[in-house]
Amino acid sequence: MSSTALYTVPTAGPDDVAALKALDGHSASDILAVIGKTEGNGCVNDFSRTLSAAVWHPLLEDSAITVFSGGAEGVISPHVNIFVRDERQYSGHPRGLVTAVGRTRVIGPEEIGRPAQVDAVHETVVALLTELGVGPDDVHLVLIKCPLLSSDAIAGVHRRGLRPVTTDTYESMSRSRAASALGIAMALKECDRDRALLALEGRDDVWSARASASSGAELDDCHILVVAESDAAANPLRAAHTAMRDALDIQALTEVFDRIAAEGGTVRQIFAKAEADPSGAIRGYRHTMLTDSDVNATRHARAAVGGLIAALHGNGAVYVSGGAEHQGPSGGGSVTVIYDVPATANATGEASR
């Protein structure tokens, strides 16, 4: 179990590691996870993610993970969120935020987007909950970086006489996110395996407000971060989660922000998923995110939701990731808010729902 501190630091580019100097006395050996937004396109050929991973990994312990989400469209500002191990006991805080990180086994290209990936994610998340000593109800965020299918990987699957889940590299990002999110839902007991596999086939509606998955070409396993609250920790950090029902759902956000304010809390960071409503309309009005041949729909969605969340937060260094398959209701997205409370405030995490 790792009691946690969080530092959100702007970056000057994908290769910027200056955040190591902004950890309030913590060192690189204390880092559990680096979760960043980079200014690439967020698509298959976004090498800003690869660059960030390449410069950060040699600086971290082998047990630490990185998750870099490409796409800083609109007002989203590139940054890193660094979760560090903080075993200090803060008086006046009967509980606090805890995190655990891990990796699945290597996901074979023929397994991406399929039940094997769902199962691998489920098994790893369950193991991380056990490590933390928490139950599913204590968890506010499970954030995953998962692999995609490159052209070479697809060709290799065919050479072995197998079939990939898709031959479209961009679609493989969606399929991988979907399988990862359903593995999370299983681990948090939001569905059983039968329902998860039906949802994977598009025959059931399963989603989690605590799942956040993004995919990339820079890894062949899944990097996983679990964020929960625990009575075994004593720090000022808390978390709350909700789901936006669509890209305009400011009410879902303000309700959480208001409850945090009622606790005397201060918002530290927002982790959100966003997608273009697959129906082609939002609240009865047609949108063109899915029919724009110049800009991918995930980029439109990040810009729209990123602007909404940044306006509420007061700055653009917010973690908004595109593609919300099974991560919130269709057309919406999961949201987790991490905040801190003063020692004299109600520290029971009542903002959560």
From Swiss-Prot:
Similarity remark: Belongs to the cyclic amide hydrolase (CyAH) family.
Region (RU B): 96-231
UniProt EC number: 3.5.2.15
Species of origin: Rhodococcus sp
Top-level lineage group: Bacteria
Name of the protein: Cyanuric acid amidohydrolase
TM region positions: none
GO molecular function: cyanuric acid amidohydrolase activity; metal ion binding
GO biological process: atrazine catabolic process
HAMAP family: Cyc_amidohydrol
Upper taxonomic lineage: Bacteria, Bacillati, Actinomycetota, Actinomycetes, Mycobacteriales
Stated regulation of activity: Inhibited by barbituric acid.
Annotated site residues (Important for substrate specificity) in this chain: T298
Active-site residues per Swiss-Prot or TrEMBL entry: K145, S214
